[in-house]
Amino acid sequence: GQPLIFDYKPGNAGGVAMDLIAKAPADGYTLYFFDSGPLTVAPHMGRVTYDVNKSFTMLGHVCGSGSMLVAHPSTPFKTVTDVVATSKRESDKWSYGTSGVGGPHHLSGEYFKSVTGAVLLHVPYKGGGPAMADLMGGQVPLLFSSLGPVVSAAKAGKVRPIAVTSLKRSNAFPDVPTFDELGYKGFESVAWYGLMGPAGMPADVVARLSRALTKVGEDKAVMEQINATGCDAEILPADQTLEKIRADSAKWGKVIKDANIKPE
């Protein structure tokens, strides 16, 4: 193996890092462990400085993590059916919180509304921490959240898990159903991660890196380490990853347009 230098580049919801990798030398020594948002969501939310289809060399998909619909225990919500039926019946009463406008949990919530017809007002917070605090305190009845913060809160009985937005049940919550198995076939809202480099990387370098990524998927210990982070490991080749980008971009573009989501 070779040593790796990790260079964290926050800013503009991943846009800063995307711009840097697009302009980096295409020699295989500068790679980006990316999240899907800048490729599938950001282009629908405003102007980006990179071309999703031309600025990068895709290597593959690594893992993905869904959102969870969670309720405060004082609410009447124990199932997705409860949420949909009650919110339709009492259309001016119920809301759901998220970590912010245009993030994966907001998109999960609006996607949920579009598929089920649930009537819920979106309450954006400045981060997942304040959102979870208000859910536990009863200031907001429902929350779309990443799974990590729910674990301890659910064990303490402070929140009630309803359903997860991935197609498979979460390893952390094996008893919590997916929307898909509850009858909303194909319902999936997952923030996922992959590996890519700048456009124009030599074919032999791409092949070597792709083989290395495939070996990661064959290493049970490494896959378990990835799963332990709360991100469900699944190594996919570049062609399947690109197809996933196209499908997700089409889905989120429609959700963003229909819900009139604007960047803050």
Locate predicted features:
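N-terminal (or domain-start) structured segment
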Residues: 1-54, 93, 116-144, 153, ...
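Ligand-binding pocket segment of bilobal, Venus flytrap-like solute-binding proteins
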Residues: 84, 92-176
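A structural signal for short loop-to-beta-strand junctions that line the ligand-binding cleft
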Residues: 29-31, 50-68, 94-97, 161, ...
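Periplasmic solute-binding protein
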Residues: 40-47, 62-76, 110-115, 192-195
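C-terminal lobe and pocket-closing loops
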Residues: 64, 78, 150-218, 247-250
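Residue-level signal for nonpolar/aromatic packing positions in well-ordered secondary structure
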Residues: 6, 21, 31, 45, ...
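An extracytoplasmic/periplasmic, membrane-proximal ligand-sensing/linker region
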Residues: 114-116, 203-264
